[in-house]
Amino acid sequence: MKKIIFTGGGSAGHVTPNLAIINELNDKDWSIAYIGSYEGIERQLVEKAGIRYFGISSGKLRRYMDWKNVTDIARIANGFRQARKILKAEKPDVVFSKGGFVTVPVVAAAYTLRIPVHLHESDLTPGLANRLAKRFANTFYTSFAETAAHFPKEATTTVGSPIRRELLEGSRIQGLTITDFSRERPTLLVMGGSLGAKRINEAIRESLDTLTNTYQIIHICGKGHLDPALEGRRNYKQYEYVHDELPHFLQAADLVVTRGGSNAIFEFLALHIPMLIIPLSRAQSRGDQILNAQTFVKNGYARMLEEENLTKETLQQEVQELYNGRQTYIEAMNASQATNAVAYITEKLEQEVQ
């Protein structure tokens, strides 16, 4: 039996593309396992999918001087030893890495054991983890064509983002039934990512009096960010996090307000949902979400509102502009060349072990 180990973590965006590929490999006689951190969100998502999971020590390397770098280097070194032990025992034919700091010791360990590594980069510019990991990998995939310049030309293919099959198979009627929403009123989906988005949550809730006059709102606000005072509010449903309901909510959505994580926005592109992207600011990130958003705006798939300019007034204005021009955005997405990367990547993995 062919064997593969996946790695990736830190946020759902580093995990769900792996799950999309795993779903396909499950039908192709593969033995599958996953290496992630002890307590990261990846553990919850992977174990829920019924995949064997190995936790290792993980640390974050920062782009600035910090004493935590010293202790985190020790954690990464320990993670390398743990990953190497797991790989020696499991003897996978190939490792697939999706990014996040937990992946660095895993792909380094695979390199020392001469196990081929396939690596996918979702963002327009690679994160630090993938910049470190690329020296240990053999095959590279990117979501954006521009990203390929950061990896070896002969070993890199632009494939788009791996999208879970089930996300494309939801039911609009079921989504509206779950929320008890009307079929006649437009539905606005708000997603701040698996960890939530405080500023977006605040702006949405400050705008409810205005927005709910036009829209019914599905607000996925992140763990610990529910507002009990808003339970039972007309045309408004809030959720910390959703899993089984998500495909149905996506089909029910006429518009989406979202962060600029690559995997999420490629999912909305595949579903042809007009987007208002509010990327993480440069003060909170390396600016990758801003670049992702700018590319989608340039291609006509989305509008963008920088977090520094986010108020209830600017949010309401941008949502209305998006709704007014929704058909233009849908037509641009219909004409896009974006494809689901899952089929291509699974074929390459099959070829790797032949």
Swiss-Prot record:
Pfam families: Glyco_tran_28_C, Glyco_transf_28. Its EC number is 2.4.1.227. It catalyses: di-trans,octa-cis-undecaprenyl diphospho-N-acetyl-alpha-D-muramoyl-L-alanyl-D-glutamyl-meso-2,6-diaminopimeloyl-D-alanyl-D-alanine + UDP-N-acetyl-alpha-D-glucosamine = di-trans,octa-cis-undecaprenyl diphospho-[N-acetyl-alpha-D-glucosaminyl-(1->4)]-N-acetyl-alpha-D-muramoyl-L-alanyl-D-glutamyl-meso-2,6-diaminopimeloyl-D-alanyl-D-alanine + UDP + H(+). The keyword Cell membrane applies. GO terms for biological process: carbohydrate metabolic process; cell division; cell wall organization; lipid glycosylation; peptidoglycan biosynthetic process; regulation of cell shape. It is a peripheral membrane protein. UDP-N-acetyl-alpha-D-glucosamine binds at residues 11-13, 164, 194, 289. Pathway: Cell wall biogenesis; peptidoglycan biosynthesis. It is found in: Cell membrane. Keywords: Cell cycle, Cell division, Cell membrane, Cell shape, Cell wall biogenesis/degradation, Glycosyltransferase, Membrane, Peptidoglycan synthesis, Transferase. One of its GO terms (molecular function) is UDP-N-acetyl-D-glucosamine:N-acetylmuramoyl-L-alanyl-D-glutamyl-meso-2,6-diaminopimelyl-D-alanyl-D-alanine-diphosphoundecaprenol 4-beta-N-acetylglucosaminlytransferase activity. Cell wall formation. Catalyzes the transfer of a GlcNAc subunit on undecaprenyl-pyrophosphoryl-MurNAc-pentapeptide (lipid intermediate I) to form undecaprenyl-pyrophosphoryl-MurNAc-(pentapeptide)GlcNAc (lipid intermediate II). This is UDP-N-acetylglucosamine--N-acetylmuramyl-(pentapeptide) pyrophosphoryl-undecaprenol N-acetylglucosamine transferase. It comes from Shouchella clausii (strain KSM-K16).
